[in-house]
């Protein structure tokens, strides 16, 4: 099992380089991804041990802020967020390895994107370790372009169908349900793929699906960035982007399993919260004008079948 974990780690660290390099090629000023390598030592007072590399870009003309973060951590006991639906795992030791990214563009016409790919092994120090993969990618637009959502979902469907034709409808629905703000009765964006507890096939089959899915993120996102990054925008557009970013913050702090897991397990706070947008705003009881571009987005982000 250790060999398989290391193989996934090698894939993720190479993917991190591929993604940051591809994104930097679209940046038009001197902003670059900066590498922040960290390590939590094996000491008795640390709940979580391990290491990682958070790559951050800030202040770009195209990417106002972005993080592509790798981590490999282990602990003596899974936190409550990881065992809420699997009580049989309570008290087990664990290893978790993953890559998580969030990209916040400056231009309101370029959507925010998020992706995460991970493996968990519970009871890795026992004769019968329990493994599962999780991950996916999702898109959060501020202004609607139907062709962008279609391209995003078509890319997701193509990679799923290569492995299992039941995956796309199942993981698309799961994504719509997961990235939903109950207190707002709103979806965070137009969704994509979300899966967890993936171990329905052999390890190698699941590994191949997850790595193919991870490799397709750039195919899904880069064409949208290239198409929208030079669209002129007004202060009104920017203000609406900042207002909608507030929903992103609310979801991450209230519902996101990765954030909750990291904080409950004593993870590295700076890396866990690096996905937050650089600026977000809240307006009391604000409502968009009827018929405005801003009002349209609330219909646009409702779950639908994007691929006819």
From Swiss-Prot:
The keyword Lipid metabolism does not apply. Substrate binds at residues 100, 116-118, 266-268. The active site is at residue 114. The record marks 183 as: Important for dimerization. The keyword Cytoplasm applies. NCBIfam families: PRK05330.1. This is Oxygen-dependent coproporphyrinogen-III oxidase. It is found in: Cytoplasm. GO terms for molecular function: coproporphyrinogen oxidase activity; metal ion binding; protein homodimerization activity. Its EC number is 1.3.3.3. Residues 248-283 are annotated as: Important for dimerization. Its cofactor is a divalent metal cation. PROSITE patterns: COPROGEN_OXIDASE (PS01021). It catalyses: coproporphyrinogen III + O2 + 2 H(+) = protoporphyrinogen IX + 2 CO2 + 2 H2O. It is an enzyme of class 1 (oxidoreductase). Homodimer. It comes from the Bacteria. The lineage of its organism: Bacteria, Pseudomonadati, Pseudomonadota, Gammaproteobacteria, Thiotrichales. A divalent metal cation binds at residues 104, 114, 153, 183.
């Amino acid at each position: 099992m250790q060999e398989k974990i290391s193989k996934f780690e090698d894939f993720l660290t190479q993917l991190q380089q591929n993604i940051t390099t591809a994104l930097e090629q679209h940046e038009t000023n001197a902003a670059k991804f900066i590498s922040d390598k960290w390590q939590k030592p094996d000491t008795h007072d640390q709940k979580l041990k391990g290491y990682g590399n958070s790559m951050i870009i800030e202040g770009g003309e195209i990417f106002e802020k972005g993080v592509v973060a790798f981590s490999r951590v282990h602990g003596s006991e899974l936190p409550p967020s990881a065992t809420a639906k699997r009580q049989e795992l309570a008290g087990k030791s664990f290893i978790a390895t993953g890559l998580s990214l969030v990209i916040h563009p400056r231009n309101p016409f370029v959507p925010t994107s998020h992706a995460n790919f991970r493996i968990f092994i519970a009871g890795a120090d026992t004769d019968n370790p329990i493994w599962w993969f999780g991950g996916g990618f999702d898109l959060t637009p501020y202004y609607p372009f139907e062709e962008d959502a279609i391209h995003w979902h078509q890319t997701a469907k193509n990679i799923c169908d290569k492995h299992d034709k039941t995956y796309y409808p199942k993981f698309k629905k799961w994504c719509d349900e997961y990235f939903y703000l109950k207190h707002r009765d709103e979806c965070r964006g137009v969704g994509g793929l979300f899966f967890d507890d993936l171990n329905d096939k052999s390890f190698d089959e699941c590994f191949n699906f997850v790595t193919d899915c991870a490799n397709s993120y750039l195919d899904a996102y880069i064409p949208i960035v290239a198409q929208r990054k030079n669209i002129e925008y007004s202060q009104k557009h920017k203000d609406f982007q900042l207002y909608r970013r507030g929903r992103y913050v609310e979801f991450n702090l209230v519902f996101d399993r990765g954030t909750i897991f990291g904080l409950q397990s004593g993870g590295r706070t700076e890396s866990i919260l690096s996905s937050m947008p650089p600026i977000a705003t809240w307006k009391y009881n604000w409502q968009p004008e009827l018929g405005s571009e801003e009002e349209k987005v609330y219909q646009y982000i409702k779950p639908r079948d994007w691929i006819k």
